[in-house]
Regions:
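A short, structural micro-pattern
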Residues: 30, 40, 106, 229-232
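Solvent-exposed alpha-helices and their adjacent loops that cap or buttress functional pockets
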Residues: 27-29, 130-133, 230
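Glycine-rich, charged/polar anion/phosphate-binding loops
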Residues: 19-22, 32, 145, 220-224
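Short gly/ser/thr-rich secondary-structure transition/capping motifs
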Residues: 27, 139-142, 219
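C-terminal substrate-binding/active-site "lid" region of AdoMet-derived donor-dependent transferases
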Residues: 169-245
Length: 295
């Protein structure tokens, strides 16, 4: 990185570069290196361990498909669990729904403080969480896998908003974690996680999908372009019980006025490139007409 640009490299020497004005803060927490930059055209940028996490002008392109796909598919989401999400974008989107309560479990308090003080994409929710002022939400500073392993509560939806599967986030991509998540869901429940760049981290996406498919009753892999990431970006959803992941509640969706995720084009998210579809079929040898792959 020169003094004017931030570059994140992906496999194959393929990168994404942004022109920056200045570095706002750099801090080494117990778990990760956290940086915030002011970019030339995209507002503030959050970087963790050298990887772009979000751009202020465009972060909804990640948070909307992560959150609203599952919350609009679930017929009655009342209790939600977020693992990670310290920047505040995921809980901001969750609280736009008529839920009863959301539990947010974040391992690193430093990312919350930095996001609250410098990013400010959360509409004040992080401050309210820390000060116990948000009646529909609670914040727990804890390792997500330890929390869900010992959790006695039952949730309708579990959303994992983590960094890529390295260092502190690696256990969140393990079969054990997915087993705990399945157990923590109600008899009709949904789970979702990000799974990396489809083209440049293909094996990560396939591995994540494969593990979730082994644990959940159904599994779906879908993609959406994300500003600041090498897109298309992949997401994997796991279904417990009888929930039709093809069916979106369009009446609820109309009230949200989303900017990036289009519920009316929900099925388009699941159109996979031919090479990946063939790869999944060779591995699992079953499909339905919605490009989901069942165990």
């Amino acid at each position: 990185m020169d003094s004017e640009h931030f570059i994140e490299w992906y496999p194959g020497n393929y990168g994404i570069a942004l022109k920056i004005k200045n570095k706002i803060i750099e801090k080494e927490s117990k778990y990760q290196k956290i940086e915030v930059y002011e970019t030339e055209n995209f507002g503030k940028m959050l970087v963790i361990d050298g990887k772009i996490q979000l751009l202020e002008n465009g972060e909804k392109s990640y948070h909307e498909p992560l959150v609203h796909t599952v919350l609009l598919v679930h017929p009655n989401p009342r209790h939600v669990l977020i693992i990670g999400g310290g920047d505040g974008g995921t809980i901001r989107e969750v609280l736009r729904h008529d839920i009863e309560f959301v539990e947010m479990v974040e391992i690193d308090r430093e990312i919350i403080d930095i996001s609250m003080d410098y990013l400010k994409i959360d509409n004040g929710i992080l401050y309210n969480l820390i000060n116990k002022l948000e009646p529909r939400a609670n914040l727990i500073i804890e390792d997500g896998i330890e929390y869900i392993k010992n959790c006695k509560e039952i949730f309708d939806v579990i959303i994992v908003d983590s960094t890529d599967p390295f260092k502190a986030a690696e256990p969140l991509f393990s079969e054990d974690f997915y087993k705990y998540a399945y157990r923590a869901l109600d008899e009709k429940g949904l789970f979702i996680t990000q799974a990396g760049s489809l083209y440049f981290l293909t094996e990560n996406a396939i591995e994540t999908y494969s593990k979730i498919r082994k644990i959940f009753d159904k599994a779906y892999i879908f993609t959406s372009p994300v500003v600041g990431y090498v897109s298309p970006w992949s997401f994997v959803a796991g279904v417990k019980g009888n929930i039709d992941f093809k069916k979106v509640d369009l009446e609820r969706a109309k009230k949200l006025k989303l900017e990036y995720y289009d519920p009316e084009s929900h099925e388009a998210l699941f159109y996979l490139p031919r090479y990946l579809k063939d790869r999944l079929l060779s591995l699992f040898r079953s499909e339905n007409n919605f490009l989901s792959f069942r165990r």
